[in-house]
Amino acid sequence: MSGGEQWMLIGEYELRTDHKGRIAIPVRFRETFRDGLVVARGFDKCLLVYATAEWVRLAERLASMPLTNINSRRITRLTFSGAFDLGLDGQGRVVLPPALRQYAGISDEVVLIGAYSHLQIWSREFWNEEKQFMIEHAAEISEAVEM
């Protein structure tokens, strides 16, 4: 979003991929992605979906890291090599590239979750495991991040 607008991407949505590997982005989020989106590998066997403008901000932070630091180079390579500049079709669908579907273990059932500034796409199986873990360990997780 631009200017002083405040927005956040929240919620949990169960979706299905079609035979072309597309998912329909929920209507409430489509305006956020009307100018394009980037789908990338996440750290937790999920996919990350950023509005192009938000992705540019993330990319600028990555690009400003020191090239002399091996971990800076590695995270930059990991992030950009697994990112795809995409858009929504007329029905609000986005094609999830095969390499990303394979990485995240996505076949036909997926869960899309809001993560404030971006969306995450999980295979239903991986999401159910992660969600159960988070529920069971919520107090410890909150303490670890000093929430």
Locate predicted features.
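Flexible "stalk/tail and boundary" regions
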Residues: 1-15, 19, 27-86, 90, ...
